[in-house]
Amino acid sequence: MKLQHIKKQLLTVALTTVAMGAMAQSLNSAYYTEDYKFRHDLNPAYGNDQNYISIPALGNVSVNTHGNFGYQDVVMNNPMYGVENGAKKMTTFMNPYISTSDALDGFSTGNNRITGDVNIALLSAGFKGFGGYNTIEVNAKTSFGIALPYELFEFAKNTGNNSYDIGDIRAHAMSYGELALGHSRQINKKLRLGAKLKFLFGIARADVEMNDVKADLTANDKWLISAKAKANMSMKGFCYKQETKEYNDPSKGEYEYVNDVDVDGAGLSGFGMAIDLGGEYKINDSWTVNASVLDLGFMHWSNNMQAANRQDTFVFDGFTDMDVKQGNGNEVFDDKADKYGDQLADFANLTDEGDQGSRTNRHRCHHQRGCKLQASMLQENDLRLPELYTHQGCLLMDRRQTECQLGSSEMA
């Protein structure tokens, strides 16, 4: 087991994750854009002055990602650039010339998360009626997320003779269809409320977990790495494909491991429901506050195809006191290598454990809060004709990413 190989795999996961965030477009900038017809997706209390209908699959396509770490936390300026011949301008946080405090400063001491959503509006329409504004939507959606503990990055940066309790590593992805019915109305001059009922039709959900990951490197003569790996897949007609191999030790017989997947047919595998709730309150002519809770609900899946590793520990105690051939009373090098190979086969490979039955997942929920400030100023120009300038600023907080966005626009 080569630690450098492990570190490269961890870096690949981190770079792939943050790259998804770098390519994303955020819809939050449209939160206070009055002419944006799909603001009700951010807060169901919002309506429109006009009726509308979108072009199927082209009316609204959105990609959103949220996270508490980014590309700049993984890839950094190389302190040896221009100092050492051949040094590249950029390097990773694992570079030995970058201090541990600087390398790990951008990562949360809890879980480091990136989540994302892709939404394609197959049909969307809005119209006035029933005392308010109504929306009907048919959407194709995909969501994904990954959670990496701080200790994982600490292990990658400071691999040495220490004990590391890394914790749980989790990733998931889900694809589903959505039928959403929304209604909003003005309660009084100051308050507007809205709600949206969503029917969810599950296509597929995948969850990959490595639980209780630990690395004990304190002993000079033995390294121990442990983790319980598990993959769960809910999808109609899905199954794991396995291959049979023989252990290096003939006395252990054969083992099976997952090397491919197969989908026989297609269709819906899950059903769920969710609601959006939102409100907007006008304090006075200058201040307006609003809040929304989105995707509060669940998804129930009819199957759960599971695969897991057979052995949750890998022990490496070196190649000391080895003989090349039998006869000197010591363990033979080839036999020791075969033992490690068999141990790794059980630790690193997944085995099909069949359908575990139905399961229910909580739908990922988030909420947003915002406020809008509008101020007017009377100004005279050279012709002494009055001009009214309106400055509007907004502050939006999205609880999925714990960051504030400040935007403003000027209209003459």
Question: Can you name each region flagged by the protein language model?
Answer:
Residues 118-146, 172-198:
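Hydrophobic alpha-helical hairpins/lids featuring a short glycine-rich hinge
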Residues 2-11:
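Bacterial N-terminal signal peptides that target proteins for export
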